[in-house]
Amino acid sequence: MIGRLCGTAEQIEDGRCLIDVSGVGYVVFCSARSLAALPAPPARATLLVETQVREDAITLFGFIDAAERDWFRLLTTIQGVGAKVALNLLSALPPDQLASAIAASDRGAITRAPGVGPKLAARLISELRERIAAMPTGSAFIPTGTAPPVAPPQGKLADALSALVNLGYRRAEAEAALSAVQAEAGEDAALDELIRGGLRRLAR
């Protein structure tokens, strides 16, 4: 699994860029915000990366910072929000504005993103409003009186979860399996131990 690319930005096109790393060119799909933050080619560039593995393709999604990457991960847990729609949302609204729109139930702002209609905007607001406090820039936008959300997996657990989701497992199932593995193995369990244990449980 690729987590970061450091190389030369050779091309920047609509919705994607080409990063050369030691002679290998990686096509990376990005939000308009991340693409705008890249230097004019050819120039050194670094992107955080989420890897999506399917039977017919391996797709890379790049982010200029961890906040945008974490929001991409969160958005793609919502039914109806695939990678393309998540990037559209992050192109239309950077993380702080997206958090503000969700907290304020501002469907109009959210539907500015291509592919997001009123029903999907309502679902995003309903399912994410109490979860954004755990996200970068999110804590300032939580309405008073809401219950604190459960923090998402961090560190090695988050990396293991991302690996299992990229292999095609549903996020909720993968998270439950990894929680059980960590409970047995302890907080010091290595990343490969978490992944192998999660795979064993998911294969049952």
Swiss-Prot record:
GO terms of biological process kind: DNA recombination; DNA repair
Gene Ontology CC terms, in alphabetical order: cytoplasm; Holliday junction helicase complex; Holliday junction resolvase complex
Chain residue ranges for the region called Domain III: 154-204
Chain intervals for the UniProt region annotation (Flexible linker): 144-154
Keywords for the protein's UniProt record, in alphabetical order: Cytoplasm, DNA damage, DNA recombination, DNA repair, DNA-binding
Domain of life assignment: Bacteria
HAMAP family in the cross-refs: DNA_HJ_migration_RuvA
Domain comment quoted from the record: Has three domains with a flexible linker between the domains II and III and assumes an 'L' shape. Domain III is highly mobile and contacts RuvB.
Entry similarity comment: Belongs to the RuvA family.
Annotated protein name in UniProt: Holliday junction branch migration complex subunit RuvA
Organism encoding this protein: Acidiphilium cryptum (strain JF-5)
Source lineage: Bacteria, Pseudomonadati, Pseudomonadota, Alphaproteobacteria, Acetobacterales
